[in-house]
C-alpha cells in the first residue's frame, strides 16, 4: 500500500463502487505519476526475484536450462494472472468512493453486510497489520539488493555494502519530516527511465538465446511444477517475489485513477518486466554462474556503476512509496478506531495526503536498520519477504468476494466463481512462503502479530470503555430538561463539549456544573464521526440540531482519509444559522485516567496494554487542531 507522493487527487470520486473516470488532471501526467509511485516496488523486483527463484529451483547448485525456463514461465504467468487479471482487471473496479487499499475495501465490505461485520473488521486488521511487516522489509531488501551490485565492480567493496545501505536508509527516513513534494515530481520520469533501461538491457541476451521466448508458453510452468515436487513448491515462494508490490495498484487507486494505472501497467511496466526476466533467464541459460547476480551481469562493465546508482535511486523511490503508505494506513487506522491518536504533521499545503507521523517514522527506521544488521544480504532477507504480502492478498481476495456479492449484487455462485481461482492461487503462494518461516519468514509474522494485537486491543478496549461510560453517565435529554426548569447562573460566550456519545451528558459538562455551578449562554454538544468513506463533501460535514434554547448538538463527519480540523468544520455551521466565533468559544475536553478493573471483559495483560496505549495517545487538542488557548481540560478517573 502506498500513498500521496506527488499525487494530486485527480479523480471525481465514484460513488457506485465501480471506480472510473478521472477528469481534473492530465491523463499523461497521471500515468507518469503512477509509474513513479505505484510501480516502484514491483519495478525493482528484478534485482532479486529471478535469482532467488532459480536458486530455489536448483537447490543451490547449477540450474538446468529447463528449470530456468520453468522459473521464467512461472514469473511471467504470475505477473499475468495475479497482477493483470486480479488487480488491473477486477479489483481496480472495487473502489470506495474513488479510494482503494485494504482498509478502504474493509469499509466498503462493511456497508454491504448486516451481519458478520466483525469478521470483516478482523480481516481488515489482519491485512493492515501485515502491511507494516511489508513496510519494514521493502526498504531494507530493495536498497540492500541495489547496493550489492557494486560488489561486481570489485570484491573490495563487499565490507561496505551494509554500512552504505544503512547510511542511505537513515538519510531516507531523516528527510521524511520535510515532506517529499519537491522531489516527488521527479519520481515518474526516473522510474520511466528505469523501466526503459531494464527492458532494453534484455535484448542482447534474448537475441543470443531466443529459445528463452518459449517460456511465454504456460506449459513450461506447468511442467516444472509437475516434475519438481516439493522443490517446485518451494520455488513458488521465491517466484512470488516478482509480484510483491501488486497491492500498490489498488492502494493508490484514489491518487491516480483506474485508467492511468492500467495504461502504465499494460504499456510500460509489464512489457519492461517481462523483457527483463526473459533476458535474465537467457543469461543464466548461457552461463549458469551468472545466477550470482543476473540483473547486473546483463550490463557491460562500463555501465555497472551507473546502473548501481540508478538502481539505488529506484529502490529509494520504491521505499518512499511504502513509507508514505505506512503513514496513510496509520491515519486510516486511527480514523477507523483501530489505533490511538498519533501526532500527524502535514508537509504540504497543496496536498492534504502529504503527511508525516514522527512515531511511525522512528519505529520504521529502527526496525529497518535492525533487519539490515540481522540479515546482512538481500538473499538472506528475501526469505523473510513474501509472507506478509501473500497474507494481504488472501485477505483482499476474501473481502473482494464480499464486495462483489453484497455491494455489486452478484449471485454468491458467480462471485465465488470469479474470485475462487485467484484465492486458490493466493493460498498456494501463501503456503509456499510459509515454508520459509524459520529462514526469516518469522519476521513479518512477528511484526504483523504485534500490530494486530495492538489494533485488536485498542478496538476492543475502546468498545468496553464506551459501554461502561454510557452506563455511568447521565442521559443528556434528562439533564437538559432539568437545567431548563432550574437554570444555574449564566456566563457569556459559547461552551463546546466534546464527546463520543451524544446521548449522554459529557463528563466535562457535569464537572463544570458541579465545580463552577454556572452554564454558558450557548452550549454545544460536539460529536466527531468517521464515515466509512474516504472523504466527506463539505455540504455534508456538519449536522446541527437545536435541542433547547440553551443547548444544541453538532455532529462533524470526516472521511477516514481526512485529518479532522474542528474549528474549520465549525465555521461551516455559520451557513446553518449558528453564530460561531472562535474567540468567544471555550472547548471543554475530558481527560481520562484509566485503571484496570477486577472484571473488565479483557485479560489482565490486555487491560494494561490498552491503558498504556491510551496514555501514549496524542492530545485531542492537537489532533483535532483546536487552539490550545481556547481549551479547558477536565480530568476524570475511570476503571476498565
Curated annotation (Swiss-Prot):
One Gene Ontology MF term: potassium ion transmembrane transporter activity
InterPro entries for this protein: K+_transporter (IPR003855), K_trans_C (IPR053952), K_trans_N (IPR053951), Kup (IPR023051)
Keywords tagged on the record: Cell inner membrane, Cell membrane, Ion transport, Membrane, Potassium, Potassium transport, Symport, Transmembrane, Transmembrane helix, Transport
Region (Disordered): 1-20
Superkingdom, natural source: Bacteria
A GO cellular-component term linked to this record: plasma membrane
Assigned protein family: Belongs to the HAK/KUP transporter (TC 2.A.72) family.
The protein's name in its UniProt record: Probable potassium transport system protein Kup 2
One Pfam family this sequence matches: K_trans_C
Described purpose of this protein according to its UniProt entry: Transport of potassium into the cell. Likely operates as a K(+):H(+) symporter.
Chief location category: membrane
Membrane topology term: Multi-pass membrane protein
Catalysed transformations (reactions): K(+)(in) + H(+)(in) = K(+)(out) + H(+)(out)
Transmembrane segments: 30-50, 71-91, 117-137, 155-175, 183-203, 224-244, 265-285, 294-314, 363-383, 385-405, 410-430, 437-457
Compartment list: Cell inner membrane
Amino acid at each position: 500500500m502506498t500513498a500521496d507522493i506527488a499525487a494530486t487527487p485527480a479523480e471525481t470520486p465514484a460513488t457506485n463502487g465501480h471506480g472510473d473516470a478521472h477528469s481534473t488532471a492530465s491523463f499523461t501526467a497521471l500515468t507518469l505519476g503512477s509509474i513513479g509511485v505505484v510501480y516502484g516496488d514491483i519495478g525493482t523486483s528484478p534485482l532479486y526475484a529471478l535469482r532467488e527463484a532459480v536458486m530455489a529451483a536448483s537447490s543451490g547448485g547449477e540450474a538446468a536450462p529447463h528449470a530456468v525456463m520453468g522459473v521464467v514461465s512461472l514469473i511471467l504467468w504470475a505477473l499475468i494472472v495475479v497482477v493483470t487479471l486480479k488487480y488491473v482487471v477486477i479489483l481496480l473496479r472495487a473502489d470506495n468512493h474513488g479510494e482503494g487499499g485494504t482498509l478502504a475495501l474493509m469499509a466498503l465490505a462493511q456497508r454491504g453486510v448486516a451481519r458478520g461485520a466483525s469478521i470483516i473488521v478482523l480481516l481488515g486488521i489482519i491485512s493492515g497489520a501485515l502491511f507494516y511487516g511489508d513496510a519494514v522489509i521493502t526498504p531494507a531488501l530493495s536498497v540492500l539488493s541495489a547496493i550489492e551490485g557494486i560488489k561486481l565492480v570489485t570484491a573490495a567493496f563487499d565490507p561496505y555494502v551494509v554500512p552504505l545501505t544503512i547510511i542511505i536508509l537513515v538519510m531516507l527516513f531523516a528527510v521524511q519530516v520535510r515532506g517529499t513534494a519537491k522531489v516527488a515530481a521527479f519520481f515518474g520520469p526516473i522510474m520511466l527511465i528505469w523501466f526503459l533501461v531494464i527492458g532494453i538491457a534484455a535484448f542482447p541476451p534474448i537475441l543470443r538465446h531466443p529459445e528463452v521466448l518459449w517460456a511465454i508458453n504456460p506449459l513450461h510452468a506447468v511442467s516444472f511444477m509437475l516434475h519438481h515436487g516439493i522443490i517446485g513448491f518451494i520455488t513458488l515462494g521465491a517466484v512470488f517475489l516478482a509480484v510483491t508490490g501488486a497491492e500498490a495498484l489498488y492502494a493508490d487507486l484514489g491518487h491516480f485513477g483506474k485508467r492511468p494505472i492500467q495504461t502504465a501497467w499494460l504499456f510500460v511496466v509489464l512489457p519492461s518486466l517481462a523483457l527483463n526476466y526473459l533476458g535474465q533467464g537467457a543469461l543464466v541459460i548461457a552461463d549458469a554462474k551468472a545466477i550470482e547476480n543476473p540483473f547486473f551481469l546483463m550490463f557491460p562493465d562500463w555501465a555497472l556503476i551507473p546502473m548501481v546508482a540508478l538502481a539505488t535511486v529506484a529502490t529509494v523511490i520504491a521505499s518512499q512509496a511504502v513509507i508514505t503508505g505506512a503513514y496513510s494506513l496509520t491515519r486510516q487506522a486511527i480514523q477507523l478506531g483501530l489505533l490511538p491518536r498519533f501526532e500527524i504533521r502535514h508537509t504540504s499545503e497543496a496536498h492534504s495526503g502529504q503527511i508525516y507521523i514522527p512515531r511511525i517514522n522512528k519505529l520504521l527506521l529502527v526496525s529497518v536498520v535492525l533487519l539490515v544488521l540481522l540479515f546482512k544480504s538481500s538473499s538472506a532477507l528475501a526469505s523473510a519477504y513474501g509472507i506478509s504480502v501473500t497474507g494481504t492478498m488472501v485477505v483482499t481476495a476474501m473481502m473482494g468476494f464480499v464486495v462483489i456479492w453484497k455491494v455489486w449484487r452478484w449471485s454468491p455462485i458467480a462471485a465465488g466463481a470469479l474470485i475462487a481461482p485467484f484465492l486458490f492461487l493466493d493460498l498456494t503462494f501463501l503456503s509456499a512462503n510459509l515454508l520459509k518461516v524459520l529462514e526469516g519468514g518469522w519476521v513479518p509474522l512477528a511484526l504483523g502479530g504485534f500490530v494486530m494485537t495492538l489494533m485488536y486491543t485498542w478496538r476492543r478496549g475502546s468498545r468496553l470503555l464506551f459501554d461502561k461510560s454510557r452506563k455511568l453517565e447521565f442521559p443528556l435529554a434528562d439533564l437538559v430538561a432539568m437545567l431548563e426548569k432550574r437554570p444555574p447562573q449564566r456566563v457569556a460566550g459559547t461552551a463546546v463539549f466534546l464527546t463520543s456519545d451524544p446521548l449522554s451528558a459529557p463528563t466535562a459538562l457535569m464537572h463544570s456544573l458541579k465545580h463552577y455551578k454556572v452554564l454558558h449562554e450557548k452550549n454545544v454538544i460536539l460529536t466527531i464521526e468517521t464515515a466509512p468513506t474516504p472523504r466527506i463533501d463539505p455540504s455534508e460535514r456538519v449536522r446541527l440540531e437545536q435541542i433547547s434554547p440553551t443547548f444544541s448538538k453538532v455532529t462533524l463527519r470526516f472521511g477516514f482519509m481526512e485529518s479532522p480540523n474542528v474549528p474549520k468544520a465549525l465555521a461551516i455551521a455559520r451557513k446553518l444559522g449558528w453564530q460561531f466565533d472562535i474567540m468567544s468559544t471555550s472547548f471543554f475536553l475530558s481527560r481520562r485516567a484509566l485503571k484496570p478493573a477486577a472484571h473488565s471483559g479483557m485479560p489482565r495483560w490486555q487491560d494494561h496494554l490498552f491503558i498504556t496505549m491510551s496514555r501514549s495517545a496524542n492530545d485531542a487538542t492537537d489532533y483535532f487542531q483546536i487552539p490550545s488557548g481556547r481549551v479547558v481540560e477536565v480530568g476524570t478517573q475511570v476503571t476498565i
